[in-house]
Amino acid sequence: KYEQLPALNNVPTMQRYFKDNDYYTLSGGKVLHHGFSGRLAGDIDQSLGRTKSPRPSQPLNRPANWSRAWDWGKHPENDTEMADYQLAKNAAKALHEDFEKPFFMSVGFFRPHVPLYVPPKWFDLYDADSFLLPKNPKSDLNDLPENFLGINNYAAAPTHAEVVKHNKQRSLTHAYLASVSFVDHCVGIIMEALKSSPHADNTLIVLWSDHGFHLGEKQHWAKRTLWEESTRVPLLFAGPGIAAGTICSEPASLIDIYPTLVELCMLPKNLHLDGISLAPQLRDPDTPRVYPAITSSYAGNHSIRNRDWRLVVYKDGAEELYNHQNDPDEFHNLAGHPGYKVIRDELARWLPLESAPEFKANSERSRASTRKQSKPH
């Protein structure tokens, strides 16, 4: 839980910071993993609800020895039974309220998290036999450090070998696409409500996901890798002063969202933050950024990603290096090649110098690692 992580003891959530600066705060769904409880309960003025979608009484597709969460299929029958749909409707309704002050609304949709249950009509959008599956050379993992599975083997997810053995890759991918389309519809409900609300012309919108998701790429499923499929997410901004349809190719991190909104809303700077505002790139997407995107997975394992390269360094010193200009799928590990030492060393300057011990909360599944934000060294 957020409130149990020692490194965050004195750090206000984004909701609390905006509330302390005279914003009315609304939140619903999976914004924090365990919700705004304990000392965080007062961060939210109005709840938009946090319910669970129904599950079938029996598994629909998962093999018997797989985790209970790793099931998927056409369930329930209608959108109205889905928690994400109900949340979208609650948020849409709230947008027509008069808050008498600026508002900060956070909406956390559950899908496309497993289990991948959504109503039949979302599956019907796709022909399961027609979409392309990821390229997956059998030799892809041959140039990786011997112990890379130490952090990449996410126990809750099936291995790629298990997915292939049971012939489930296409079926699982179909369910993921259906889930994305369903949640896209939920986002659309809120956007349409905003367009017809009194807040249409003075509201900033940010859309992102908390992590990426492997669908067999690099012979992996789900998350918790330091590769592109797990660490890259959509990040969209819209609103006053932001040009529509522009794309910025500079690296960014999710911790940059907080200081970006603080700057765009002209609030006092929060000195607790490690992120760097993206406001310059929102004004001009060609504005370069000095900082790469730094991702950590468990204590001591880090990825450094700039526009063209990714360096992965594990806590035992093993490394991976990928050239995204020529190898966007990260098939060819260039770590250790003398010709790339200068590039490797430049990226390594950003590696965090200190990692806190892995933190375990009340349950074995609630784990987090923290680090001091890196500056070049």
Name each model-derived stretch:
Residues K1-Y314, A318-E319, P328-S355, F359-S363, ...:
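Formylglycine-dependent sulfatase
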